[in-house]
């Protein structure tokens, strides 16, 4: 890492508070982890340069159906769990000097 052009990461927020940052969305490292809150549990998967909610115990499953996100500015929201996943980082236009 270290400021490569187009580098991106993901931030996970619960109820508006940053609770986890994923600094490597590298395609060769697929893995999953659980985010457990007082409102429920979401299983987050990282891989293929993307991040997504693979399993959630919320009622509407909108976050699961949202699919993979991989571009700066994209978000996945689980409203029942008050969880937001956001891709942050430079776009190619931002990296031009």
Locate each region found by the language model.
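N-terminal post-signal-peptidase region of extra-cytosolic proteins
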Residues: 30-33, 37, 58-67
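Short polybasic amphipathic segments
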Residues: 9-12, 31-33, 50-53
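Aromatic-capped interface at the extracytoplasmic side
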Residues: 1-13
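Local cysteine-cluster metal-coordination motifs and their immediate loop/turn environment
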Residues: 59, 64-65, 74-82
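Non-cytosolic head/periplasmic domains of membrane-anchored proteins
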Residues: 76-97
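Glycine- and acidic-residue-biased ligand/ion/polar-headgroup-sensing regions
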Residues: 40-42, 46-56, 81
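Short extracytoplasmic
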Residues: 15-43
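Short acidic-glycine loop/turn motifs at beta-strand connectors
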Residues: 15, 47-49, 91
